[in-house]
Amino acid sequence: MSHVKAFVKKYWITAVLIVAICGGYWGVTHAGLLDSVLFPTPERIWKAFMTYADTMPLNFTSSMALLIPSLALGTVIALALGVLMGMNRRVRDTIYPIVYAISVVPAILLSPFALHLAPSFTAASMFLIVYNTIWATLFATVTGIMTIDKRYLDNAATLCLSGPRKLVKVIVPAAMPSILSGFVTSLRSSFLVLVFAEMYSAQYGMGYFVKKNADFGLYDNTWAGFLFMILVLVVVMQIFEKIKNHLLRWTMD
């Protein structure tokens, strides 16, 4: 019961704002103040959602099958390179300008090259998501390691920790707040790239569903798919927030 009260206390203002936004949208659409094609009424959106209720889970699993491996691979690359750059000043000074120059190129601009060079459309889509995932997590890892409180390193020296043990026991945990902050940015932006990536290789997927219906001018379906994607993103972010709080339970709130 205490958890329910805490949840209500934390999110009641959010709930009021959501109800106000939905009520406002209902009012302006029924009053004819917006284009009825681009902005269908909530009833039409709900009807479209119920029509494709059986398809939505399939779209979800298809998107996750593309997104999760890509996120995992991108995160591994970002952590490996970020730790190397963060701990070795010479490596950092040598490759940081190159990494920074590459990172400013949007993933979408690389799509023509990915489509021509990748062995399949799926591989091209995964490359775009991996590429997009790397940079925020990479730079956050470098920053987190570079700004570690010197007391942590002194304590590690006192305990005679070095090499992999020092990395796992001291450096990575101390840099974890920064790393997770960067990963949140990567996670959010990956959904945007997912929509673009699914244009090429998907027959199902949340982004594919939205783009396909938008191309055909079926905006009832487009809104239904769009809101479903938002719901998924909110749930994913809440799950990650729980994981982050567990990993950072040793820090101050």
Residue ranges and their predicted role:
Residues 145-151, 155-175:
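Short helix-to-coil transition segments within interhelical loops
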Residues 127, 131, 163-197, 240:
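Transmembrane alpha-helices
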Residues 69-99:
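Transmembrane-helix boundary motif in ABC transporter permease subunits
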Residues 182-231, 241:
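Non-cytoplasmic
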Residues 1-19, 238-253:
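Transmembrane alpha-helical segments of polytopic membrane transport and secretion proteins
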Residues 100-136, 143-144:
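Generic hydrophobic transmembrane alpha-helix motif, especially the helices
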Residues 89, 146, 181-184, 223-253:
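C-terminal transmembrane helix and the adjacent membrane-cytosol boundary/short C-terminal tail
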Residues 6, 30-72:
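Periplasmic/extracellular loop-to-transmembrane helix junction in inner-membrane transport proteins
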